[in-house]
Amino acid sequence: MSYDEKSQKTLAVVKAMEEALGANSNSMDKHFHKDFRWMGNQGCGTKNNLEEFRNNWQLPLRAAFTDRIYKPDRFLVDGEWASCFGHIDAVHSGEFMGIKPTNKRVKIHYTDFWEVRDGLIIDNWVNVDFPSILAQLGVDVFNGQGWEAFDRGEAEPPKPN
């Protein structure tokens, strides 16, 4: 198999999994290797198998956010690796990080990096923009100290000595 063919096969595996997530599939095992690992940023945690992924990520996300529309913006592939950045449009209809449901529509920005082995996803490194979600729900995790204030001209950025 050529490198380009391998890349296209990897992309097909990842897109099929993304479609299954978007369709609320409960049969995700056909997309993941038996040794699957899901490694998220702070607040997301690490899931060491498909059962942990389902119980500690997929179902809590469904409980907190309904009317989800998955919108992958771009896929990049390189052999057995694929990456995607995008967002999920959703309604905050269940408790999230201690915040009671607000029924606000939010954007959940994410970036994923997947490794595909033998036609199955074995590793998934994930970054979900929790500070942005929380800000949309009225919680400023930076307590007014976010560097966006520099961009808006509201604060002077520090300079190195």
Regions found by a protein language model. Name each.
Residues 1-30, 34, 144, 149-161:
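Short, low-complexity N-terminal intrinsically disordered segments enriched in polar/charged residues
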Residues 10-18, 38, 57-61, 82, ...:
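Short, structured motif recognition centered on aromatic/hydrophobic residues
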Residues 22, 90-92, 116:
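Beta-strand elements of well-folded, non-transmembrane domains
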Residues 26-81, 87-89:
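A solvent-exposed, acidic/Ser-Thr-rich amphipathic alpha-helical stretch
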Residues 42-45, 91-109:
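A cross-kingdom feature marking solvent-exposed beta-strand/loop segments within repeated
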Residues 125-134:
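Short, solvent-exposed aromatic-acidic interface loops
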Residues 71-75, 109-114:
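Hydrophobic/aromatic beta-strand elements that line small-molecule binding cavities or substrate pockets
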Residues 99-101, 134-139:
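A short acidic/glycine-rich loop-to-helix N-cap element
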